[in-house]
Swiss-Prot record:
GO terms for cellular component: cytoplasm; nucleus; proteasome regulatory particle, base subcomplex. It comes from Encephalitozoon cuniculi (strain GB-M1). SUPFAM superfamilies: P-loop containing nucleoside triphosphate hydrolases. Keywords: ATP-binding, Cytoplasm, Nucleotide-binding, Nucleus, Proteasome. GO terms for molecular function: ATP binding; ATP hydrolysis activity. The gene is RPT5. It is found in: Cytoplasm; Nucleus. ATP binds at residues 189-196. Acts as a regulatory subunit of the 26S proteasome which degrades poly-ubiquitinated proteins in the cytoplasm and in the nucleus. It is essential for the regulated turnover of proteins and for the removal of misfolded proteins. The proteasome is a multicatalytic proteinase complex that is characterized by its ability to cleave peptides with Arg, Phe, Tyr, Leu, and Glu adjacent to the leaving group at neutral or slightly basic pH. This is 26S proteasome regulatory subunit 6A. Belongs to the AAA ATPase family. Its main location: cytoplasm.
Length: 401
Protein backbone atom coordinates (compact mmCIF):
# COMPACT_ATOMS: atom_id res chain seq x y z
CA UNK A 1 0.00 0.00 0.00
CA UNK A 2 1.38 3.38 -0.99
CA UNK A 3 1.81 6.41 1.24
CA UNK A 4 -1.02 8.31 -0.55
CA UNK A 5 -3.48 5.45 0.06
CA UNK A 6 -2.57 5.37 3.78
CA UNK A 7 -3.10 9.13 4.09
CA UNK A 8 -6.48 8.87 2.35
CA UNK A 9 -7.48 5.99 4.64
CA UNK A 10 -6.31 7.96 7.68
CA UNK A 11 -8.67 10.78 6.82
CA UNK A 12 -11.67 8.54 5.99
CA UNK A 13 -11.37 5.71 8.56
CA UNK A 14 -8.73 6.05 11.32
CA UNK A 15 -9.43 2.61 12.90
CA UNK A 16 -8.88 0.70 9.69
CA UNK A 17 -5.71 2.68 9.12
CA UNK A 18 -4.23 1.63 12.49
CA UNK A 19 -5.12 -2.00 11.86
CA UNK A 20 -3.37 -1.93 8.52
CA UNK A 21 -0.27 -0.40 10.12
CA UNK A 22 -0.21 -3.09 12.81
CA UNK A 23 -0.52 -5.80 10.17
CA UNK A 24 2.35 -4.27 8.21
CA UNK A 25 4.50 -4.20 11.34
CA UNK A 26 3.74 -7.88 12.02
CA UNK A 27 4.74 -8.80 8.47
CA UNK A 28 7.99 -6.85 8.75
CA UNK A 29 8.79 -8.47 12.09
CA UNK A 30 8.14 -11.91 10.59
CA UNK A 31 10.41 -11.17 7.64
CA UNK A 32 13.06 -9.84 10.02
CA UNK A 33 12.96 -13.07 12.05
CA UNK A 34 13.25 -15.15 8.88
CA UNK A 35 16.21 -13.10 7.65
CA UNK A 36 17.85 -13.26 11.07
CA UNK A 37 17.43 -17.03 11.05
CA UNK A 38 19.07 -17.19 7.64
CA UNK A 39 21.93 -14.98 8.85
CA UNK A 40 22.46 -17.26 11.84
CA UNK A 41 22.43 -20.31 9.57
CA UNK A 42 24.99 -18.72 7.25
CA UNK A 43 27.19 -17.75 10.20
CA UNK A 44 27.01 -21.32 11.47
CA UNK A 45 27.90 -22.67 8.03
CA UNK A 46 30.83 -20.25 7.78
CA UNK A 47 32.06 -21.26 11.22
CA UNK A 48 31.75 -24.95 10.31
CA UNK A 49 33.59 -24.44 7.02
CA UNK A 50 36.33 -22.40 8.71
CA UNK A 51 36.81 -25.18 11.23
CA UNK A 52 36.94 -27.71 8.38
CA UNK A 53 39.44 -25.55 6.47
CA UNK A 54 41.60 -25.19 9.56
CA UNK A 55 41.48 -28.94 10.08
CA UNK A 56 42.42 -29.59 6.46
CA UNK A 57 45.24 -27.05 6.61
CA UNK A 58 46.58 -28.77 9.69
CA UNK A 59 46.43 -32.11 7.88
CA UNK A 60 48.27 -30.58 4.91
CA UNK A 61 50.88 -29.14 7.27
CA UNK A 62 51.39 -32.52 8.91
CA UNK A 63 51.52 -34.26 5.54
CA UNK A 64 54.10 -31.76 4.30
CA UNK A 65 56.36 -32.76 7.15
CA UNK A 66 56.47 -36.31 5.79
CA UNK A 67 59.07 -37.34 3.20
CA UNK A 68 58.05 -36.71 -0.40
CA UNK A 69 58.48 -38.80 -3.48
CA UNK A 70 60.29 -36.93 -6.24
CA UNK A 71 58.67 -37.33 -9.62
CA UNK A 72 58.09 -35.72 -12.99
CA UNK A 73 55.01 -34.43 -14.74
CA UNK A 74 54.44 -36.67 -17.77
CA UNK A 75 51.37 -34.96 -19.22
CA UNK A 76 48.85 -32.28 -18.23
CA UNK A 77 45.52 -33.54 -19.60
CA UNK A 78 43.12 -30.72 -18.68
CA UNK A 79 42.69 -28.04 -16.03
CA UNK A 80 42.34 -30.64 -13.26
CA UNK A 81 43.89 -33.99 -14.22
CA UNK A 82 47.31 -35.16 -15.28
CA UNK A 83 49.83 -38.00 -15.39
CA UNK A 84 52.90 -38.09 -13.15
CA UNK A 85 55.83 -40.45 -12.96
CA UNK A 86 57.14 -41.12 -9.45
CA UNK A 87 60.70 -41.96 -8.53
CA UNK A 88 59.49 -45.53 -7.96
CA UNK A 89 59.17 -45.71 -11.79
CA UNK A 90 55.38 -45.96 -11.52
CA UNK A 91 53.18 -43.74 -13.67
CA UNK A 92 49.94 -42.53 -12.11
CA UNK A 93 46.85 -40.84 -13.51
CA UNK A 94 45.56 -38.17 -11.12
CA UNK A 95 41.95 -36.94 -11.58
CA UNK A 96 42.99 -33.97 -9.42
CA UNK A 97 46.72 -33.31 -9.57
CA UNK A 98 47.03 -31.72 -6.14
CA UNK A 99 47.92 -28.40 -4.55
CA UNK A 100 49.58 -26.86 -7.62
CA UNK A 101 47.25 -25.52 -10.36
CA UNK A 102 47.60 -27.31 -13.67
CA UNK A 103 48.22 -23.97 -15.37
CA UNK A 104 51.58 -23.82 -13.54
CA UNK A 105 52.66 -27.35 -14.50
CA UNK A 106 54.50 -28.36 -17.66
CA UNK A 107 55.59 -31.80 -18.90
CA UNK A 108 59.01 -32.57 -17.47
CA UNK A 109 58.62 -30.40 -14.36
CA UNK A 110 60.11 -31.82 -11.18
CA UNK A 111 57.44 -32.16 -8.47
CA UNK A 112 57.06 -33.48 -4.92
CA UNK A 113 54.45 -36.26 -4.61
CA UNK A 114 52.63 -37.71 -1.62
CA UNK A 115 54.09 -41.11 -0.88
CA UNK A 116 50.66 -42.82 -0.72
CA UNK A 117 48.36 -40.91 -3.08
CA UNK A 118 50.95 -39.47 -5.51
CA UNK A 119 49.17 -36.10 -5.55
CA UNK A 120 51.38 -33.09 -6.25
CA UNK A 121 52.36 -31.13 -3.14
CA UNK A 122 55.01 -28.77 -4.48
CA UNK A 123 56.81 -27.79 -7.65
CA UNK A 124 60.53 -28.34 -7.20
CA UNK A 125 63.42 -26.42 -8.77
CA UNK A 126 64.89 -27.93 -11.95
CA UNK A 127 67.29 -30.80 -11.38
CA UNK A 128 70.60 -29.19 -12.37
CA UNK A 129 73.97 -30.42 -11.29
CA UNK A 130 75.33 -28.52 -8.28
CA UNK A 131 78.53 -27.82 -10.19
CA UNK A 132 76.56 -26.09 -12.94
CA UNK A 133 74.58 -24.02 -10.45
CA UNK A 134 77.83 -22.87 -8.86
CA UNK A 135 79.11 -21.64 -12.23
CA UNK A 136 76.40 -18.98 -12.48
CA UNK A 137 77.68 -15.62 -11.29
CA UNK A 138 75.18 -13.90 -9.01
CA UNK A 139 74.03 -10.37 -9.76
CA UNK A 140 76.22 -8.98 -6.98
CA UNK A 141 79.23 -11.04 -8.12
CA UNK A 142 79.23 -10.13 -11.79
CA UNK A 143 82.52 -8.96 -13.26
CA UNK A 144 83.28 -5.29 -12.73
CA UNK A 145 85.77 -5.04 -15.60
CA UNK A 146 84.87 -2.71 -18.46
CA UNK A 147 86.23 -2.08 -21.93
CA UNK A 148 88.14 0.87 -20.47
CA UNK A 149 90.30 -1.69 -18.63
CA UNK A 150 91.44 -3.21 -21.94
CA UNK A 151 94.12 -1.62 -24.08
CA UNK A 152 95.18 -2.22 -27.66
CA UNK A 153 92.17 -4.39 -28.60
CA UNK A 154 89.80 -1.87 -30.18
CA UNK A 155 89.07 -4.04 -33.24
CA UNK A 156 88.42 -7.11 -31.07
CA UNK A 157 86.07 -5.11 -28.82
CA UNK A 158 84.09 -3.96 -31.85
CA UNK A 159 83.78 -7.50 -33.24
CA UNK A 160 82.69 -8.92 -29.87
CA UNK A 161 80.14 -6.13 -29.44
CA UNK A 162 78.63 -6.87 -32.83
CA UNK A 163 78.39 -10.61 -32.24
CA UNK A 164 77.32 -10.77 -28.58
CA UNK A 165 76.28 -7.47 -27.01
CA UNK A 166 74.37 -6.02 -29.95
CA UNK A 167 72.43 -9.23 -30.61
CA UNK A 168 71.30 -9.35 -26.96
CA UNK A 169 70.51 -5.67 -26.44
CA UNK A 170 69.17 -4.69 -29.89
CA UNK A 171 67.92 -7.83 -31.70
CA UNK A 172 65.52 -5.69 -33.75
CA UNK A 173 68.46 -4.39 -35.79
CA UNK A 174 69.15 -7.89 -37.08
CA UNK A 175 65.44 -8.45 -37.75
CA UNK A 176 65.24 -5.31 -39.89
CA UNK A 177 68.03 -6.64 -42.10
CA UNK A 178 66.57 -10.16 -41.97
CA UNK A 179 69.87 -11.69 -40.85
CA UNK A 180 70.65 -14.07 -38.01
CA UNK A 181 73.20 -13.03 -35.39
CA UNK A 182 76.11 -15.38 -34.64
CA UNK A 183 75.54 -18.12 -32.09
CA UNK A 184 78.98 -17.87 -30.60
CA UNK A 185 82.47 -16.43 -30.73
CA UNK A 186 85.85 -18.15 -30.53
CA UNK A 187 88.65 -16.01 -29.10
CA UNK A 188 92.12 -17.36 -29.77
CA UNK A 189 95.65 -16.13 -29.34
CA UNK A 190 98.77 -16.46 -27.17
CA UNK A 191 98.37 -16.60 -23.38
CA UNK A 192 98.03 -13.29 -21.57
CA UNK A 193 96.55 -11.32 -24.47
CA UNK A 194 93.26 -10.46 -22.72
CA UNK A 195 90.80 -13.15 -23.84
CA UNK A 196 89.34 -13.88 -20.40
CA UNK A 197 89.38 -10.19 -19.50
CA UNK A 198 87.44 -9.43 -22.68
CA UNK A 199 84.77 -12.03 -21.82
CA UNK A 200 84.36 -10.57 -18.33
CA UNK A 201 84.05 -7.05 -19.72
CA UNK A 202 81.45 -8.27 -22.21
CA UNK A 203 79.43 -9.83 -19.37
CA UNK A 204 79.41 -6.58 -17.43
CA UNK A 205 78.23 -4.72 -20.56
CA UNK A 206 74.91 -6.61 -20.65
CA UNK A 207 72.33 -7.63 -18.07
CA UNK A 208 72.53 -11.24 -19.18
CA UNK A 209 73.18 -14.16 -16.87
CA UNK A 210 76.88 -15.06 -17.03
CA UNK A 211 77.62 -18.78 -16.89
CA UNK A 212 81.36 -19.47 -16.66
CA UNK A 213 82.61 -22.94 -17.58
CA UNK A 214 86.18 -24.13 -17.81
CA UNK A 215 87.28 -26.86 -20.17
CA UNK A 216 89.11 -28.87 -17.48
CA UNK A 217 85.96 -28.80 -15.31
CA UNK A 218 84.09 -30.65 -18.03
CA UNK A 219 86.61 -33.51 -18.05
CA UNK A 220 85.14 -35.84 -15.43
CA UNK A 221 86.24 -39.17 -14.04
CA UNK A 222 83.04 -41.14 -14.62
CA UNK A 223 81.55 -41.94 -17.99
CA UNK A 224 78.84 -39.50 -19.02
CA UNK A 225 79.46 -36.93 -16.28
CA UNK A 226 81.11 -34.39 -18.58
CA UNK A 227 78.32 -34.66 -21.16
CA UNK A 228 75.72 -34.26 -18.41
CA UNK A 229 77.42 -31.08 -17.18
CA UNK A 230 77.31 -29.62 -20.69
CA UNK A 231 73.67 -30.61 -21.09
CA UNK A 232 72.66 -29.13 -17.73
CA UNK A 233 74.61 -25.93 -18.43
CA UNK A 234 72.74 -25.29 -21.67
CA UNK A 235 69.38 -26.18 -20.08
CA UNK A 236 70.06 -23.69 -17.30
CA UNK A 237 71.13 -21.07 -19.84
CA UNK A 238 67.87 -21.44 -21.78
CA UNK A 239 65.84 -21.11 -18.60
CA UNK A 240 67.61 -17.94 -17.44
CA UNK A 241 68.00 -16.29 -20.82
CA UNK A 242 69.39 -13.92 -21.90
CA UNK A 243 72.56 -15.81 -21.03
CA UNK A 244 76.23 -15.71 -21.98
CA UNK A 245 78.08 -19.02 -21.62
CA UNK A 246 81.84 -18.54 -21.38
CA UNK A 247 83.91 -21.69 -21.94
CA UNK A 248 87.55 -21.01 -21.07
CA UNK A 249 90.31 -23.34 -22.29
CA UNK A 250 87.94 -25.08 -24.67
CA UNK A 251 90.86 -27.06 -26.11
CA UNK A 252 90.59 -29.33 -23.03
CA UNK A 253 87.46 -30.92 -24.52
CA UNK A 254 87.53 -29.66 -28.12
CA UNK A 255 90.71 -31.29 -29.42
CA UNK A 256 90.67 -33.16 -32.71
CA UNK A 257 89.19 -36.62 -32.45
CA UNK A 258 91.49 -39.60 -32.82
CA UNK A 259 91.31 -43.39 -32.92
CA UNK A 260 92.59 -43.74 -29.37
CA UNK A 261 91.16 -46.68 -27.40
CA UNK A 262 91.89 -45.16 -24.01
CA UNK A 263 88.82 -44.62 -21.83
CA UNK A 264 89.82 -41.07 -20.91
CA UNK A 265 90.15 -39.99 -24.54
CA UNK A 266 86.78 -41.50 -25.41
CA UNK A 267 85.14 -39.67 -22.50
CA UNK A 268 86.61 -36.34 -23.66
CA UNK A 269 85.31 -37.00 -27.17
CA UNK A 270 81.89 -37.87 -25.75
CA UNK A 271 81.82 -34.53 -23.93
CA UNK A 272 82.74 -32.68 -27.12
CA UNK A 273 80.00 -34.48 -29.06
CA UNK A 274 77.47 -33.34 -26.47
CA UNK A 275 78.79 -29.78 -26.84
CA UNK A 276 78.34 -29.98 -30.62
CA UNK A 277 74.84 -31.34 -30.13
CA UNK A 278 73.92 -28.48 -27.80
CA UNK A 279 75.35 -25.88 -30.18
CA UNK A 280 73.09 -27.28 -32.90
CA UNK A 281 70.11 -27.50 -30.53
CA UNK A 282 69.22 -23.81 -30.30
CA UNK A 283 68.81 -21.01 -32.78
CA UNK A 284 70.83 -17.83 -32.84
CA UNK A 285 67.74 -15.85 -31.76
CA UNK A 286 67.19 -17.68 -28.46
CA UNK A 287 69.18 -15.14 -26.42
CA UNK A 288 71.87 -17.69 -25.52
CA UNK A 289 75.37 -16.76 -26.67
CA UNK A 290 78.59 -18.75 -26.45
CA UNK A 291 82.05 -17.27 -25.92
CA UNK A 292 84.92 -19.75 -26.10
CA UNK A 293 88.59 -19.02 -25.50
CA UNK A 294 91.75 -20.98 -26.28
CA UNK A 295 95.44 -20.48 -27.00
CA UNK A 296 95.65 -23.70 -29.06
CA UNK A 297 93.29 -23.11 -31.95
CA UNK A 298 95.45 -25.40 -34.09
CA UNK A 299 94.35 -28.52 -32.19
CA UNK A 300 90.60 -27.82 -32.15
CA UNK A 301 88.30 -30.21 -33.99
CA UNK A 302 87.09 -28.84 -37.37
CA UNK A 303 83.49 -29.71 -36.45
CA UNK A 304 83.68 -27.18 -33.62
CA UNK A 305 84.95 -24.43 -35.91
CA UNK A 306 82.46 -24.73 -38.73
CA UNK A 307 79.93 -21.99 -39.43
CA UNK A 308 76.69 -22.29 -37.53
CA UNK A 309 78.40 -23.14 -34.26
CA UNK A 310 81.17 -20.75 -33.32
CA UNK A 311 80.50 -18.41 -36.23
CA UNK A 312 82.94 -15.62 -35.46
CA UNK A 313 86.65 -16.17 -34.81
CA UNK A 314 88.50 -13.29 -33.16
CA UNK A 315 92.29 -13.35 -33.01
CA UNK A 316 94.09 -11.80 -30.05
CA UNK A 317 97.69 -11.11 -31.13
CA UNK A 318 100.50 -9.77 -28.99
CA UNK A 319 100.02 -6.02 -28.49
CA UNK A 320 101.98 -3.58 -30.61
CA UNK A 321 103.87 -0.57 -29.24
CA UNK A 322 100.76 1.60 -29.00
CA UNK A 323 98.82 -1.24 -27.37
CA UNK A 324 101.55 -1.85 -24.78
CA UNK A 325 101.63 1.86 -23.95
CA UNK A 326 97.88 1.85 -23.41
CA UNK A 327 98.05 -1.28 -21.22
CA UNK A 328 100.81 0.21 -19.07
CA UNK A 329 98.83 3.42 -18.65
CA UNK A 330 95.70 1.49 -17.66
CA UNK A 331 97.46 -0.48 -14.93
CA UNK A 332 99.40 2.56 -13.71
CA UNK A 333 96.49 4.99 -13.57
CA UNK A 334 95.65 4.18 -9.94
CA UNK A 335 99.30 4.06 -8.84
CA UNK A 336 101.34 6.94 -7.44
CA UNK A 337 103.42 7.61 -10.55
CA UNK A 338 105.69 10.59 -11.15
CA UNK A 339 104.67 12.97 -13.91
CA UNK A 340 107.94 12.54 -15.81
CA UNK A 341 107.42 8.81 -16.50
CA UNK A 342 107.75 8.26 -20.26
CA UNK A 343 105.29 5.53 -21.25
CA UNK A 344 106.39 5.70 -24.89
CA UNK A 345 109.89 4.63 -23.89
CA UNK A 346 108.50 1.92 -21.60
CA UNK A 347 106.36 0.58 -24.45
CA UNK A 348 109.39 0.38 -26.75
CA UNK A 349 111.33 -1.42 -24.02
CA UNK A 350 108.67 -4.13 -23.65
CA UNK A 351 108.89 -5.51 -27.18
CA UNK A 352 107.35 -9.01 -27.29
CA UNK A 353 105.47 -8.65 -23.98
CA UNK A 354 101.83 -9.68 -23.72
CA UNK A 355 99.18 -7.86 -21.71
CA UNK A 356 99.72 -9.92 -18.57
CA UNK A 357 103.46 -9.23 -18.64
CA UNK A 358 102.81 -5.49 -19.04
CA UNK A 359 100.67 -5.65 -15.92
CA UNK A 360 103.47 -7.54 -14.17
CA UNK A 361 105.86 -4.71 -15.10
CA UNK A 362 103.65 -2.23 -13.21
CA UNK A 363 103.47 -4.55 -10.20
CA UNK A 364 107.24 -5.05 -10.14
CA UNK A 365 107.80 -1.30 -10.52
CA UNK A 366 105.64 -0.75 -7.46
CA UNK A 367 107.57 -3.40 -5.53
CA UNK A 368 110.87 -1.77 -6.52
CA UNK A 369 109.67 1.60 -5.24
CA UNK A 370 108.42 -0.07 -2.07
CA UNK A 371 111.84 -1.58 -1.38
CA UNK A 372 113.42 1.87 -1.77
CA UNK A 373 110.78 3.39 0.55
CA UNK A 374 109.63 5.85 -2.10
CA UNK A 375 106.29 7.65 -2.16
CA UNK A 376 106.12 7.78 -5.97
CA UNK A 377 107.12 5.37 -8.73
CA UNK A 378 109.76 6.71 -11.11
CA UNK A 379 110.97 5.85 -14.60
CA UNK A 380 113.88 3.84 -13.18
CA UNK A 381 111.46 1.76 -11.10
CA UNK A 382 109.56 0.86 -14.25
CA UNK A 383 112.81 -0.06 -15.99
CA UNK A 384 113.71 -2.28 -13.03
CA UNK A 385 110.28 -3.90 -13.36
CA UNK A 386 110.90 -4.55 -17.04
CA UNK A 387 114.25 -6.19 -16.26
CA UNK A 388 112.61 -8.33 -13.58
CA UNK A 389 109.86 -9.58 -15.90
CA UNK A 390 112.36 -10.02 -18.74
CA UNK A 391 114.62 -12.16 -16.55
CA UNK A 392 111.69 -14.40 -15.65
CA UNK A 393 110.74 -14.64 -19.30
CA UNK A 394 114.21 -15.82 -20.33
CA UNK A 395 115.08 -17.90 -17.28
CA UNK A 396 115.29 -21.67 -17.44
CA UNK A 397 114.62 -24.02 -14.57
CA UNK A 398 117.12 -26.82 -14.08
CA UNK A 399 116.03 -29.91 -12.16
CA UNK A 400 118.55 -32.22 -10.53
CA UNK A 401 117.85 -35.68 -9.23
Amino acid sequence: MSLEELEAMDQSNPGEFLERVREKIRMLNSETRILQSRVNTIKHDISTKNASIAENMERIRLNKQLPYLVGNVVEVLDEHSGVVNASTRMSSYLPITGLIPNSELRPGDLVALHKDTNIVFEKLPPDYDMKVGGMVLKSDAKPDETYEDIGGLERQIEELNEAIVLSLTHPERFEKLNIKPPKGVLMYGPPGTGKTLMARACASKTNATFLKLAGPQLVQMYIGDGARLVRDAFALAKERKPTIIFIDEIDAIGAKRSDSDQTGDREVQRTMLELLNQLDGFSSSEEVKIIAATNRVDILDPALLRSGRLDRKIEFPLPNTLGRKRILQIHARKMSVRDDVNFDELARSTEGFNGAQCKAVCVEAGMAALRKEKTEISQNDFMDGIQEVLSRKKSKLLYFT
